[in-house]
Amino acid sequence: MKKVIALVLLVALVISLVACSTAPASPTSSAAKDTKDQLYIEVSALGNLDYFYDHKLGMKKVGEDLGVKTEYVGPAEYDMNAMVAAFEQAIAKKPNGIVVVGFEDSLNPVVKKAQDAGIPVVTVDADLPASGRIAFVGTGNKNAGIMGGEKLAQLIGTKGKVAIMTKPGQSNLEERVAGYKEALKKYPDIEIVQIVDTKSDPVVAAQAAATLLQKYPDLAGIACVEAAGGSGAATAVKEAKLQGKVQIIAMDRGNDVVQAIEDGVISASVAQQTALMPYYATQILYNLANSKVDITTDNKAAGVQGIPAVVDTGVIIVDKTNAKYFMRQAK
């Protein structure tokens, strides 16, 4: 009888231990309830460009993975006044954090306004270091330009005339242009003949590239540091029937660029891992709200935020060897 009682007690003890060990995994835990209503918003412009599909994808994915609400807002065109208005509307929603593409310094005041209201802001893609933002997540832009410059130099046999297509005034693009210049200056037989404004518009870029080809009939290469440039340059080179004669280095991995690589019109593209930018920016904001790392005995008193200040999401060279893996499926 004593053995039976002992066995019953042992079984009861095992059951209670198992129940205790599995309890924290319950989906109805207080942590899950606390975060499911949290809201994180990305504010951008140029939402009509294929490039920003990956921004939207990154925000959607991080929301699903963290179990929080996410939104992507902002104008379809390059309109800073409309973007500021979208940012103001985002502040009014009192989100747990805001992710913003730092196109221009004109965004600094509204970023500071959010910070002053207790809403932390992380910049992505292009930085606003004077805005008071808590972190930047994006490409090491100068290094991206250096990689593109080295690739272009090899494609043209380290000699010849080249042009660079950009949108002046954006800090991230200026850094890429600086990277191209640094890479190409190592080759004395390469001359940068002109830097052209695309206005981040594929149609304008195509017209600008066509003018370049007429002005410099011996042009060896075109370097593009933003998404519209590659598409426009490809259109102009194809219409002039100069595929293979004028080497194009594009930027990023829109389907039109990837197809042009497979068709032999664009030689290669420097592709950012764009979806990682809003993904990790939101992760930083989420951690700031929910899971602080004790860097010191008192982070707040010590002036320590306990988050990375800069995250480099890196770039990948896309060419004929790997282009097929970058083609997006139908949205």
Residue ranges of model-derived segments:
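Short, low-complexity disordered leader/linker segments with a strong preference
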Residues: 1-39, 64-65, 112-119, 324-325, ...
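Hinge/cleft segment of the Venus flytrap/periplasmic-binding protein
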Residues: 33-36, 183-184, 280, 284-331
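Extracytoplasmic "Venus flytrap"
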Residues: 37-66, 71-84, 101-105, 165-175, ...
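Short, solvent-exposed amphipathic alpha-helices that sit
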Residues: 51-66, 144-148, 172-190, 208, ...
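Short beta-strand elements in bilobed, periplasmic/extracellular small-molecule ligand-binding domains
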Residues: 64-77, 161-166, 181-202
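Hydrophobic alpha-helical segments within soluble ligand-binding/sensing domains
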Residues: 83, 137-162, 174-175, 204-206, ...
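Hydrophobic alpha-helical
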Residues: 88-92, 96-115, 180, 198-260
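Flexible loop/hinge segments that line or gate small-molecule binding clefts
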Residues: 104-143, 147, 154, 161, ...
